[in-house]
Amino acid sequence: MAALSCLLDSVRRDIKKVDRELRQLRCIDEFSTRCLCDLYMHPYCCCDLHPYPYCLCYSKRSRSCGLCDLYPCCLCDVKLYCLRPSLRSLERKAIRAIEDEKRELAKLRRTTNRILASSCCSSNILGSVNVCGFEPDQVKVRVKDGKVCVSAERENRYDCLGSKKYSYMNICKEFSLPPCVDEKDVTYSYGLGSCVKIESPCYPCTSPCNPCNPCSPCNPCNPCNPCNPCSPCSPCSPCNPCDPCNPCYPCGSRFSCRKMIL
């Protein structure tokens, strides 16, 4: 459990790091698509549209064209194209970086969902379903006949040339409940990362009742097995109310029984 908790904490830290990088990339993308002269110089400087006769990048560098502080080789005074990289290439790089970060974030979320699903045997989480792209009011959970069904449906409407077009998107996941979980005790929650968690207040049974497992609500002992791991049900153990001896052996050790038979 300690190793699993450490792994989940590491995945959460990675997801937060990716979210921060995505926000930084969005800021860079907004900065790169906007000209600081309040004109869209895309993809070139377009000095003919500048309100000044020339770009004045060298005389008023800090006021008229703030980009020249980053690219000092601007040749706007002679009405040539700027030697800085094209904003289109910067946009393409930013878009590729954003797509890579989104794929990495989706991969981390899938890994987290798999870890949560695999940890169901050691926690009260029975299952986890990813419903990314759906609102909480569009998700429905139904528990019936020992099964949990998670479904979600969304309607998209498009206006095209005066006509309306519709498209539908839906998912449906179903899994069975453990034998010791009551349907009335099953609850669900819409958590972080568009993930629906199915939970129960009682832990699922992981192993059958045996003398080495003490009594618990989900693991009741057999009448022949005492509620003590050190006292298994066998003819060799001493007499006590929870562990009666075999009629062939009196209350004592095996030596006394063998002596009586001889």
Curated annotation (Swiss-Prot):
Sequence-type repeats, residues: 34-38, 73-77
Keyword Cytoplasm: yes
Span list, region C-X-P repeat region: 209-250
SUPFAM superfamilies, per database record: HSP20-like chaperones
Span list, region 2 X 5 AA repeats of [RC]-C-L-C-D: 34-77
InterPro entries reported in the protein's UniProt record: A-crystallin/Hsp20_dom, HSP20-like_chaperone, ODF1_ACD, ODFP
GO cellular component entries: centrosome; cytoplasm; manchette; outer dense fiber; sperm flagellum
Keywords linked to the UniProt accession: Cell projection, Cilium, Cytoplasm, Cytoskeleton, Developmental protein, Differentiation, Flagellum, Phosphoprotein, Repeat, Spermatogenesis
Cellular location(s): Cell projection, Cilium, Flagellum; Cytoplasm, Cytoskeleton; Cytoplasm, Cytoskeleton, Microtubule organizing center, Centrosome
Domain of life: Eukaryota
Keyword Ribosomal protein: no
Main location: other
Domain notes: The C-terminal contains many C-X-P repeats.
Physiological role: Component of the outer dense fibers (ODF) of spermatozoa. ODF are filamentous structures located on the outside of the axoneme in the midpiece and principal piece of the mammalian sperm tail and may help to maintain the passive elastic structures and elastic recoil of the sperm tail.
Assembly notes: Interacts (via leucine zipper motif) with TCP11. Interacts with SPAG4. Interacts with KLC3. Interacts with CCDC42.
UniProt protein name: Outer dense fiber protein 1
Species annotation: Sus scrofa
